[in-house]
Amino acid sequence: MKKAYLYIVIWAMAAACTPHNKPSNPTTTQQVDSIYTESEFRRYGDYYNSGHQVYAIDLLSEGLDYDSTGHIVGTGCNLYLSDIFAPKDSIMRLPAGTYTMDSVAKDMHFLRGMYFEGSVTGAYLLMIQESQIQRIMLLTRGTMTIDYVEKDVILDFNLYLADSTQYHCTYIGPATYR
């Protein structure tokens, strides 16, 4: 019985957030069916004294949650984007529009995933199983589109891993700013 349960957990995790290779037919779109159910938006102000408001977005898939200390627990996929740059006057929330992944701080851009001083930063995916990070995948190019409908935010991500594997996902729900 334990073996069957383990297979189900592994299958569910893979189904929740496994990227797919880019399709060979350029007229079709391959999508990933990551289902993100929780979001946390963080405001850092003009963190780098660069004239930009800096934000981060943390999305959790089904099966993940935060414990009382703020650590991620459970099994699933965590999409994290740090260093999202918005115009200086965007002090309440990220403005609607399309943001492009880049390696420099510019309005309506966010930093690509990278290792910096022994830590991962920028845009990346964490595959988590039983509250332990199993895999880190850096995102190296792509876009994020933000829209707002009443109290909900709509996030549409068209991102790529370092090996050019496409990762597409969406989030629709409340935008909790901290």
Named regions from a protein language model:
Residues 13-16:
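C-terminal motif of bacterial Sec signal peptides marking the signal peptidase cleavage site
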Residues 25-43:
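Post-signal peptide N-terminal segment of mature Sec-exported envelope proteins
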Residues 7-8:
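Sec-dependent N-terminal signal peptides
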Residues 23-26, 83, 140-144, 156-178:
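Edge beta-strand at a domain terminus
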Residues 18-21:
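Bacterial signal peptide processing site
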Residues 48-145:
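Surface-exposed helix/loop patches within compact recognition domains
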Residues 1-4:
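Positively charged n-region of N-terminal signal peptides that target proteins for export
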Residues 54-55, 150-156:
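Short, hydrophobic/aromatic-rich segments at coil-to-beta transitions
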